[in-house]
Amino acid sequence: MATATVATTPEGIPVIILKEGSSRTYGKEALRANIAAVKAIEEALKSTYGPRGMDKMLVDSLGDITITNDGATILDKMDLQHPTGKLLVQIAKGQDEETADGTKTAVILAGELAKKAEDLLYKEIHPTIIVSGYKKAEEIALKTIQEIAQPVTINDTDVLRKVALTSLGSKAVAGAREYLADLVVKAVAQVAELRGDKWYVDLDNVQIVKKHGGSVNDTQLVYGIVVDKEVVHPGMPKRIENAKIALLDASLEVEKPELDAEIRINDPTQMHKFLEEEENILKEKVDKIAATGANVVICQKGIDEVAQHYLAKKGILAVRRAKKSDLEKLARATGGRVISNIDELTSQDLGYAALVEERKVGEDKMVFVEGAKNPKSVSILIRGGLERVVDETERALRDALGTVADVIRDGRAVAGGGAVEIEIAKRLRKYAPQVGGKEQLAIEAYANAIEGLIMILAENAGLDPIDKLMQLRSLHENETNKWYGLNLFTGNPEDMWKLGVIEPALVKMNAVKAATEAVTLVLRIDDIVAAGKKSGSEPSGKKEKDKEEKSSED
């Protein structure tokens, strides 16, 4: 590592610039160190890429094991120290939050671009020229995706299902992907809203509940909400049809006074009257609820035992300590309103569901709220024989939900299997000579990096990458073969659109943007100044966590 903490004047007098323990890496060494970090992260993810990719076993400091091939999860659980590595993880997380998929594509493409940039640096091409060439290549890549993308609407159920199948195909749950893809498409279509002429999908309205037990094929879609609580009183009904639901953000308990108060009781009759008055207060609250016609109460706060007794006597099913998010979803699903004051509750505030029922799921009891007229919130109850299978199924479903939502929102899809990448590379090679100069080399390097994704797909499937790449290049010379990609199960080039390997155009575009942004950012850095670590100080991670906690309290 090149270090320079001391400089000298023309007279040779030393001048201390940085504190003792600090280090500085600059020039080509800084560039190479940053590129090496990007390449190292790519190497960690490369073997998981594509439907024939492998899984990673991640063990944390407590010994907890995660088995996954989800790019965002792997990066999240990697304890990275290098600042450039952390930067790449942030970009990958941004990709995951924006489009729910394509994190591996973004990181691996960034790694390939970094490798090609390193080759150009060895040829004495300045980083600024490489960045300029990469930016021009990015524009062509995005333009290509926009031009070849196929329009898709929310009514194209078959295409949406294929998008879900493609996303699930690379996950550990691929054996149940046909069944899960149907659930995903139905769930997203149910919560989608038309605003003006654009479709909007808020995936927060798809509740995911996990319960260990059964198999992945026991996973079910509920047109309503699953509340992970049981009915509060054994005397209450466990099943209510044509349910009228009161959603309460208020407790069914005798509230304590805000100010400290003392009550002096001189004889037992006063104590009896005191308890009787408490009971009357609770009875009045229950009577007010019953008067609205409610036969189900779902409460965010507590329900006193006396109130439970009176609710049971009136045949009302009640649930307490429900999560705030569950109440909000129930309001959307049933058309009800969350009420903070029981005195203000009216029949107009009640939600409706065809059925509210307590069911045993595994070893636990849960309350299912189903059959709302037009539920804008739905639930997916995930089952699986192992907890790790359940967790991986959740990750797979979240990615699939995100990709289907992306297609509905954006209205465009492209074929997978490397078809888009080879088409981009072809157009970049035609464009590069028009630019000329050293930038031409950078654009051609970008084309080679894009093709690197196809070679990794082929390698992970046990195929000869160069042989398959040449076959695809030859096929794409014919304009009618734009959707030809690599069928990784047969090893032959095929029309990926006809084969049903379809991906959101938005995911591809965001991956190209994220990868190019990451590499151009790295190429612009020519100096790394690292402060020395203070002895006996807290780990930086703990300090950051404490800062976050303090800011959240404020």
Curated annotation (Swiss-Prot):
GO molecular-function terms, A-Z: ATP binding; ATP hydrolysis activity; ATP-dependent protein folding chaperone; identical protein binding; unfolded protein binding
Annotated keywords: ATP-binding, Chaperone, Nucleotide-binding
GO biological process terms, semicolon-separated: protein folding
Magnesium among keywords: no
Compositional bias of kind Basic and acidic residues: 540-554
CDD domains reported in the protein's UniProt record: cpn60 (cd03343)
Signal peptide start-end: none
SUPFAM superfamilies named among the record's database cross-references: GroEL apical domain-like, GroEL equatorial domain-like, GroEL-intermediate domain like
Keyword Zinc: no
InterPro entries cross-referenced by the UniProt entry: Chaperone_TCP-1, Chaperonin_TCP-1_CS, Cpn60/GroEL/TCP-1, GroEL-like_apical_dom_sf, GROEL-like_equatorial_sf, TCP-1-like_intermed_sf, TCP-1_chaperonin, thermosome_alpha
Positions of the UniProt region annotated as Disordered: 532-554
Function description: Molecular chaperone; binds unfolded polypeptides in vitro, and has a weak ATPase activity.
Subunit structure and binding partners: Forms a Heterooligomeric complex of two stacked eight-membered rings.
Similarity annotation: Belongs to the TCP-1 chaperonin family.
Name recorded for this polypeptide: Thermosome subunit beta
Lineage: Archaea, Thermoproteota, Thermoprotei, Sulfolobales, Sulfolobaceae
